[in-house]
Structure formats: C-alpha cells, structure tokens
Amino acid sequence: MADGANVADVVVVGGGAAGLAGALTLARARRSVLVLDSGSPRNAPAAHVHGYLGHDGANPAELLARGRAEALGYGARIRSGAAGTVVAADRVPGGGFLVRCGDGSVVRAGRLLVATGLLDELPPVPGLRDRWGRDVLHCPYCHGWEVRDLPLAVLATGPLAVHQAGLWRQWSDRVTLLSHTWAPGRDERELLAARGVEVIEGEVTGLDVGTDDRLAAVVLADGRSVACRALVVAPRFTARSGVLTGLGLPEATIERGGRVVGTCVDSDPQTGATALPGVWAAGNVTAPMEQVAGAAAQGVRAAVAINTDLIEEETRRALRAGRGDAG
C-alpha cells in the first residue's frame, strides 16, 4: 500500500503544457495532484514558443519552469527524473490505480491524466536530428514567420509533401519540393506549379551547414546542392502511450493521404476521457498536431472533467453512507 506521500486524487503523467495546465487547474480545485515528469518535452529543441497569446516568443524551458512554479504554488507536487518516470500502471480492484515509477516508488491515484506527448521520428537523412526545431521544421504556424521570404525546401517522403509545399508557400515565394523518396504525379505537379513551387528530382543525402551554424543547402545523391535556409519534413508521430497500452487501451493510427503517419490515443475531444474508466488524456499524445496553446487548453478541459467525475463519485459515496448501504 502506498504511504501518504504517495497518494493523490489525480496523478498527471507528463509535465509539458497539457500536464501542467491540468495540474494547475486541479490544484486550484483543491485536489491533491502529483505530476510525474520524465523531463523530455517534445519542443525541447526549439528556441521559442509561438502563437501562445501572452507568451509569444517565450523560451520553452522557461515557460515550463513558470508553469511548474504556478502549479506548485497551489499545492501540486512534481517529481522528475527516475521518480517521475512511469514504468507501469495497474488498476486497483475497487477503484483507482497503482503507478510504478523508475525509482521503485509506487503511487496510489484515484484518477489518471496522461499527457505524455509524442516522439517525432524523422526521415533517415544524416544531420536532420541535429537541426530539428531550428531549420529542419514541420509546422509553419510555429516557425513560418521566422523563415519568411527565405528559400525553403520540402523533403518529399509521401503525398503529404504536396500539401506541405502549398502551405509553406504562404510564408515564402521560394519553395522547392525535393522528390526524396516520393515523386509527385502529373496532377500533383499541376497543383505545385499553380502555387509557384518548383520540383527538383533527386534523393537527399545530407545537409550543408554554413559557418554561421545555419542551414545553407541540401546535398543530393548526384552531388548537386539545392540552396535553402530551412528544410520542411514530415515526421512520423509516435505517441508515448506505454502507460495506456499497459492498461489495455490500444493505440490508434493516424492517416494522411491514405498513408499511416503515426499513432495516437483516442479520447473524447471535449473532455479528454478515454475508453478506460478513470483515465483521461490531453496534449500531443491524443492530438499530435496540437500546438502548445491547444495542448494547455486540452489539459484544462480534462482537469475540469476529472474534478467533476470525482465530485460525482464523492456524492454517490456520501449517499450510500447516509443510507447505511454497504460498499
């Protein structure tokens, strides 16, 4: 049995925007909350957060530090490192969960809010991971303004590249699609031409980074270089859903253009409730395309739903006690 320090109304798994927003909301609702944070936020490589009203341009690490301080200020508890890494979670007969952590500790939770995020799996091109979030990009709403009017290249690994090229064309009139492992057909080329996007054939084998530590070009297999200051890629989204699959909730697949581009956890879009009673999900683990502001909003909505669920359970328990019902 977990001791008093290891018992919480709600355990929040994940200390990013969704998890901390949920923890803050629950703590302000006078719930005992424990955040388990392994310390690997999705946007760690990025220098700034954009599109978050009141926080545009904030450093991601500093934004999370402020969020932790706010949640702690209302009584939430936060564990990081091994103590914040969830190894497994098991349902307890009669209600609640036992959450096992990397340091060997066990936490008893009445409800779970899973906000573990996802992993971005990049195409296997040398150098991409080192530049990810800097000048190897995915979301124009996160980074488009910073590379506006610069020469941009889109790494084509599937039909989604046509959509990406047309979208990024909003921020620059110098967009090139590179037929890396997928070449557009006649209809796609017509669409690209209508948007003013050039198509260059050839597999990308590397990146050329200038002395200013900025991307200067991509290198093709035949030795040609294509100048660009940012490279747009389509990562595969892999949900960090181990704690949920361990409880029996399978992953769902994400499809774009008839192709599977990742995995996520299904949850109610309004409340975050999953098919598992007592378990909610918020943020990129359930909505891979969500930005920081949206992930935080999901955390708040899930927290409200969890608090409501706890109130209903407490009311039922009080009714049974008043009637002298057993159990």
Predicted regions and their residues:
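Solvent-exposed alpha-helices and their adjacent loops that cap or buttress functional pockets
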Residues: 2-5, 92, 104-106, 129-131, ...
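Beta1-alpha1 glycine-rich phosphate/pyrophosphate-binding loop at the start
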Residues: 3, 8-65, 150-151, 160-182
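Phosphate-coordination loops involved in phosphoryl transfer and adenosine-cofactor binding
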Residues: 7-9, 81, 148-149, 276
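A conserved FAD-binding loop/helix module that cradles the flavin
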Residues: 22-24, 162-164, 282-327
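A Rossmann-like FAD-binding core segment of flavoenzymes
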Residues: 65-66, 71-101, 106-109, 172-263, ...
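Glycine-rich dinucleotide-binding loop and its adjacent helix/turn
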Residues: 121-166
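FAD-site-proximal beta/loop scaffold in flavoenzymes
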Residues: 130-146, 237-291
